[in-house]
Amino acid sequence: MTEFWLISAPGEKTCQQTWEKLMAATTKNNNLSTNAKFNIPDLKVGTLDVLVGLSDELAKLDAFVEGAVKKVAQYMADVLEDSRDKVQENLLANGVDLVTYITRFQWDMAKYPIKQSLKNISEIIAKGVTQIDNDLKARASAYNNLKGNLQNLERKNAGSLITRSLAEIVKKDDFVLDSEYLITLLVVVPKNNYTDWMKEYETLSEMVVPRSSNVLSEDQDSYLCNVTLFRKAVDDFRHKARENKFVVRDFQYNEEEMKADKEEMNRLSTDKKKQFGPLVRWLKVNFSEAFIAWIHVKALRVFVESVLRYGLPVNFQAMLLQPNKKTMKKLREVLNDLYKHLDSSAASIIDAPMDIPGLNLSQQEYYPYVYYKIDCNLLEFK
């Protein structure tokens, strides 16, 4: 996906002039970035004290909302499992791809009325995204439990004859059932030792029924064989079998239990399919909601920081740059040259973290212009 730089600079004689200067410096001869105006409406400014406090709160809100957006995106990838290549086409904002949404950003007046104070708007965003985050935790927990239980049952029916469930392999006819004296055991015999088994099983212990062993199934390494003997000889037979590298499985033929396991697996599989569609729909809708909220937080941050940096009356142009990956360093230099007059202390510093009291810029690059990164690379594929 894509990285954007959301910047602002004060209006020259007009904001259009600021825009034209940026375009001339970054696109005319050197193709350093693809640019778009970033439309921020006339928001209520409030007092300077409120703006300084809000700057800090918005930084925290930005990190929280970005985290929520990434969690929804990542969970979408987890839920789609084998269709992970389809994840990107499901990550939309207002029905369009993320790049289109950001480059054509329009403030959502219905969701975030600009008659409200900046603090109120930030609280509306925080409340909405907190709800999404909480709902995601609950839905993910329920679906993960269901998926985990199903995987555990599926795992039982996979693997080698030594470990897997034998319920799907054996039939009633393979056993002597309801006998007071006789019992049928299931034995895993390595293929290399099968000849030895056929020669020796009748004499491994006393009271083995002659010619009672048949091959019921096989995998790459072993055969599954049955053998019938007297109940009182079972312990001795197990011991001797182990000495000869034959593994006696703990298995009792119980039709009701086997039927219940099968029904449970079918139920879990059906439940998973039933929940899958609504869950993916919920993720799509709420990814869009969270992403839209995130870009509105970025807009709020640009507005607040621009007023704090450039003063009143409000007069700045917000601009969205999509840097050319190969020329990012050059773009930084060009922007620095273009705007270094805005802050003499930053003129010699490019990409150097600084603490500026009153402005929330610690742990972040400081430039003479307002700058926020928007990274649309929201997925971490394992």
Swiss-Prot record:
Gene3D superfamilies: 3.30.70.100, subunit c (vma5p) of the yeast v-atpase, domain 2, Vacuolar atp synthase subunit c, domain 1. InterPro entries: ATPase_V1-cplx_csu, Vac_ATP_synth_c_sf. Pfam families: V-ATPase_C. One of its GO terms (cellular component) is lysosomal membrane. The modification N-acetylthreonine is found at T2. The keyword Acetylation applies. It comes from the Eukaryota. Keywords: Acetylation, Hydrogen ion transport, Ion transport, Transport. GO terms for molecular function: proton-transporting ATPase activity, rotational mechanism. Belongs to the V-ATPase C subunit family. Subunit of the V1 complex of vacuolar(H+)-ATPase (V-ATPase), a multisubunit enzyme composed of a peripheral complex (V1) that hydrolyzes ATP and a membrane integral complex (V0) that translocates protons. V-ATPase is responsible for acidifying and maintaining the pH of intracellular compartments and in some cell types, is targeted to the plasma membrane, where it is responsible for acidifying the extracellular environment. Subunit C is necessary for the assembly of the catalytic sector of the enzyme and is likely to have a specific function in its catalytic activity. V-ATPase is a heteromultimeric enzyme made up of two complexes: the ATP-hydrolytic V1 complex and the proton translocation V0 complex. The V1 complex consists of three catalytic AB heterodimers that form a heterohexamer, three peripheral stalks each consisting of EG heterodimers, one central rotor including subunits D and F, and the regulatory subunits C and H. The proton translocation complex V0 consists of the proton transport subunit a, a ring of proteolipid subunits c9c'', rotary subunit d, subunits e and f, and two accessory subunits. This is V-type proton ATPase subunit C 1.
